[in-house]
Amino acid sequence: MNYYVSKCLVYLIYLTPFFLLTGPALPDISATLCGLCFIYLTIANKDWKFYKSKIVIFFFIFSFYLILNSSLSNNIIHSYENSLFYIRFIFFALAIWYALVNYPNVISKLFVILTVIFIFLVIDSLIQFYLGYNIFLIEYRAANRITSVFGQESILGSFLIRFLPIYISLLILKNNKKNIN
């Protein structure tokens, strides 16, 4: 069972960058499932070291503070909607940390996946800029803004700039691994 859950965790981590191209639903589901896989694997393997990090403890305390603060709000239900589910991002980050520590190929494969996504988005954006439509034959209608696969949402630059630090970090980790070996 642990084997299948760990494979599920790794594949969900690989698919999350692709899911981010589709909208918010699939990445949220992926983050939640990764967090659940992480919780299961750490309980099944009795691997508590990930929970003992000072920054993780700080984020758990901060999440508890947000939930406690939400209970003091005038609109409790709306407030809980916003604060209660932030904890899934802590578990998602822990799941990625768990995968990076326990599965050495994750760094190189995730680097390749992000490279493919970056190249695809840049080529699609250039096609959209010069031809007026993208690879999926969606017309370019935004006023002086290339949207690529994001359609009406003008978030291409935001997507690329937010993934750039992750991409550079993976590049550094990948090169450090080569130098160590």
What kind of region is each of these model predictions?
Residues 4-7, 85, 142, 159:
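Short alpha-helical segments used as structural interaction elements across diverse proteins
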Residues 27-41, 81-94, 128, 155-170:
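Hydrophobic core segments of transmembrane alpha-helices in multi-pass, intramembrane catalytic enzymes
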Residues 78-85, 141-147:
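Non-cytosolic membrane-interface motifs at loop->transmembrane helix junctions
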Residues 16, 67, 108-141, 148-181:
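Alpha-helical transmembrane segments of multi-pass inner-membrane proteins
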Residues 60-64, 89-93, 117-122:
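Small-residue-rich segments of transmembrane alpha-helices in multi-pass membrane proteins
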Residues 1-78, 98-108, 112, 170-180:
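Transmembrane signal-anchor hairpin modules in multi-pass inner-membrane enzymes, especially those
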